[in-house]
């Protein structure tokens, strides 16, 4: 079917999986991928859903046939890619973030990539890995305004299209739980409301990062540790948050807010995730279709805006699942 929805899931062990929404089995996608790929972000072209990108420990790969074949794009060796983002109006322009907090850009739909900047935070929490850019967000009304979520380095913003960055961590410095950011999303018609996900939950800024407020997910859910936050493609006042008890917990879920984060409701009603939710995907063409994945390989999908859910469990070989996309 020409309008069939495809779902893609990335794992840090055993790579990338695909299934059609109506199919019963997952396919592992390996043709052209590196050996033992560790797949992090998955990005689907907003105008051509057959074109998709994944970030791995060996750089960025592109497919032009929904994942049947893959080709490594031109990015300097040794770059582990943790985030991918399309320009909101010119999808031939793309951005990616790496482990090491480097930002690269492409002007030819990912064919070639050019170094843009490094986000330096002297107050970043020292971990066993270099600071990673786990999320990038771009303001549609003014694409020069960008935001980055750093693990474990807090939040940063740019006013010149990613060429330079300003840290916006006055409320977070010195607190590892608050500096450990996992995602960033923009809301409101002006895209001036910024939400970030961290170990404590979801925090919001109404002034582009000058100040932050804790949205206190614990008031609405017994689990509040957040692995990501996304804006609905059809409603800039709606956010989704991936939650769990902690990184490796045996409970997960999805919360949704339709009022810019003031209140939240459990969106995944009727299902029982067995581990922390790590990713959520909303079909931009059909926003009533939503999928989410858990760390241990569960995938749940709804085609009626959460009224009913179907489980699509991954093969047992799919371990440490961290990303999902659909179109």
Regions found by a protein language model. Name each.
Residues 1-327:
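Extracellular glycan-interacting surfaces
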């Amino acid at each position: 079917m020409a309008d069939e929805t495809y779902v893609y899931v990335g794992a840090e062990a055993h790579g990338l999986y695909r299934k059609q929404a109506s199919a019963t089995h997952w396919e592992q996608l390996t043709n052209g991928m590196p050996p033992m790929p560790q797949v992090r972000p998955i990005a689907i072209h907003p105008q051509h859903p057959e074109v998709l990108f994944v970030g791995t420990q060996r750089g960025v790969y592109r497919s032009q046939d929904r994942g049947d074949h893959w080709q490594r794009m031109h990015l300097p060796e040794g770059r582990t890619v943790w985030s991918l983002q399309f320009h909101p109006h010119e999808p031939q322009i793309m951005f990616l973030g790496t482990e090491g907090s480097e930002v690269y850009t492409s002007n030819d739909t990912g064919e070639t990539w050019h170094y843009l900047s490094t986000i330096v935070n002297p107050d970043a929490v020292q971990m066993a890995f270099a600071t990673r850019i786990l999320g990038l967000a771009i303001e549609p009304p003014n694409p020069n305004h960008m935001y980055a979520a750093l693990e474990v380095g807090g939040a940063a913003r740019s006013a010149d299209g990613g060429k330079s960055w300003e840290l916006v961590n006055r409320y977070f410095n010195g607190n590892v739980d608050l500096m450990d950011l996992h995602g960033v999303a923009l809301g409101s018609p002006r895209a001036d409301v910024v939400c970030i996900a961290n170990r404590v939950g979801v925090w919001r800024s109404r002034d582009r990062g000058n100040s932050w407020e804790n949205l206190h997910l614990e008031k609405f859910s017994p689990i509040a540790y957040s692995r990501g936050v996304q804006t609905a493609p059809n409603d800039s006042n709606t956010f989704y948050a991936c939650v769990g008890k902690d990184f490796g917990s045996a409970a997960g879920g999805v919360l949704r807010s339709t009022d810019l984060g003031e209140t939240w409701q459990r969106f995944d009603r009727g299902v029982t995730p067995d581990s922390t939710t790590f990713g959520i995907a909303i079909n931009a063409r059909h926003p009533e279709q939503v999928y989410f994945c858990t760390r241990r390989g569960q995938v749940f999908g709804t085609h009626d805006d959460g009224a009913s859910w179907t489980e699509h469990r991954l093969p047992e070989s799919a371990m440490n699942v961290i990303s999902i996309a659909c179109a």
